[in-house]
Amino acid sequence: MMMKTRALAWALPGVLCGPFLLGAPAHAELGAEELAKLAQNPVGNLVSVPFQNNTNLNFGPDRRTQNILNIQPVIPVSVSEDWNIITRTIVPVISQPLPDGERTDGIGDTVFTAFLSPAKPGHFIWGAGPVVQVPTNSNSDLGNRNWGLGPSLVVLRLEKGDPWVYGALVNNIWSLSDSGTGGSYNNATIQPFINYNFAGGLYLTSSPVITANWKAESSQRWTVPVGGGIGKIFHLGKLPVNAQLSAYYNVVAPDDGPNWQIRAQVQFMFPK
């Protein structure tokens, strides 16, 4: 099962992005720094397919390694001259250690967000909308069998000529039932981000994913990472690609939570 899951994870980038690679426009009108800042805007007018791999070290009671590959297609849709809807879907492919020394591999729960955002924003940009957790997990060790729903909000500042891009994305998801495997849940995600862009598409970045499990005891509730990394825009033929590598240390975590996370991301970009 593990080999099949890993083979699927490695094959998906080619399956999803192959048709675009063959016919992607040059986008010569956008420089590397502009492309980098566009990639850093969660509600930008940009079709993209990020593949984000998170390796969590010293996870679980046996302090083993957990790996999560998030496949995260982003699709903006124009609904009028003034408004866009930006859909963001996260499908996790998980390799999870089990307490008995075994390991399970498969798909976790899908998280879908639809942001309503101004089509012509100023320096300060925002988007708001619902977030839905869909129980797509392939087994009970990788997710919850109850649907979830909640609000999501993103705000950021992005100005032409300014190397800084910063903001935050927050959501909270409540389970709609407690009857399925895993029971009810109430989880928050807070992702502040800050980027400093250099000429040529090189940038420094920090985007820790802070989480809170409101149903856990207070001492086990929060995961708070600190860290950062580096990113670069390059091209595969005519296709812009955003590559990023970063590391985060959890200064606060549950007893069974990991202490380090290594994040590697490749984002295929299709600017409109």
Segments and roles (model prediction):
Residues 1-32, 272:
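Cleavable N-terminal export/targeting peptides
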Residues 28-272:
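Transmembrane beta-barrel domains of Gram-negative outer membranes and organellar outer membranes
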